[in-house]
Amino acid sequence: MQRTVLEGVGSYLPERIVTNHELATRIDTSDAWIRERTGIGQRHIAAAHETATFMGAEAARRALAAAGASADSVDAVIVATSTPDQGFPATAVSIQAAIGMTRGFAFDLSAACSGFVYGVSVADAMIRAGQCRSALVIGTEVYSRILNWEDRGTCVLFGDGAGAVLLRAGTGEDDRGVISTHIHSDGRYGDILFIDGATGQDDRPQHLVMNGREVFRHAVSKLAGAVDEALAANDLTQADIDWLVPHQANRRIIDAMGKRLGLAPEQVVVTVDRHANTSAASIPLALDEAVRDGRIRRGHLVLIEALGGGLTWGSALIRF
C-alpha cells in the first residue's frame, strides 16, 4: 500500500519578539486584555530581509536537513501563503531557487489559515497518483505587513514565521504516513475574514479585515465536523489520537477542540501564546516544535486541523 510519509519538519521564526506590553505602548490595549481573549503573550515580527521567501526557504532547508535529503531529491514545492513577496512569480518558485533546487515544479496555493492542510492534501494526492514522489509543503507568512496597526481587534492577533515538511512516497510500513485528508470551503462567508486589497488595486488599503465573533462561531462548528469526518473515514475513535496539532488562532478555540475530543491538555500542542496566529505557518511551526522536543515520536497518530478565510477548513490524520 502506497502511503505519503512525513520525513522531515523544519521551521523559522523572525528574531524580533513583540510582547503584549510593547503593543500596549502603541495602541489602546493591555497584556491582560489580549491574554484573556486570545491566549497570546507575544509574537515574532519580521525584519525587512525576512520575507516570505527568505523564511520559507530557511524552513525548507531545515526540513531537508532533518530528513537527511538534498534539495535536488525533491520533485515539488507547494507553498501556502496569503502574504507573497510579489504577485508573480510564485513564492514557491523563489524558494525553489533559494534552496538550490534545479528540477521538479513549484507553485503557490491560497487558502488563508487552512493553507497548510490544503497543501498536505494536494501533495498527498499527487504522490498517491504518481505525479511526483516527494514534495516540500511550506507555510510562510508575513502578516505584520498587512495589518492595520491602529486596529487593536486584529493587530494583536498575528505574527510572522514559516514551517515546512518533506513528504515522500512510502510503503505504508507500520501504518506510517498521511492516512487521510479532508478539505472544504464555503464562499458565502468570504466577507467575515479577508484582505481588503490586492495587486492592481492600489486604491484599497490591503489590510486584514475580520469579524471575530462570526469567525469564532464558524470555527468551532466546522472544525468539529472536519475532525469527526477524519475519524469516521478511518474507523477511528477519539481515543486513538495521540496528538492534536491545531491551527494556532485563538486559545479558546484550541481548548474547545481539545475538550471535544476528550484529550488531556498535554495532548494538544499549543504555540499561540508565543507565536500568535501565523496563518498557514502555524501548524508546521507547532509540529516542528513538538517533534524537536520529543513529544511527537515514531508511531504517534497526529490530527491536524485549521479554518481560515474563504471560508476554508480541513483536517488530516498523519501517522509519524
Swiss-Prot record:
SUPFAM superfamilies: Thiolase-like. Residues 248-252 are annotated as: ACP-binding. Homodimer. It is found in: Cytoplasm. Pathway: Lipid metabolism; fatty acid biosynthesis. It comes from the Bacteria. The keyword Acyltransferase applies. NCBIfam families: fabH, PRK09352.1. Keywords: Acyltransferase, Cytoplasm, Fatty acid biosynthesis, Fatty acid metabolism, Lipid biosynthesis, Lipid metabolism, Multifunctional enzyme, Transferase. This is Beta-ketoacyl-[acyl-carrier-protein] synthase III.
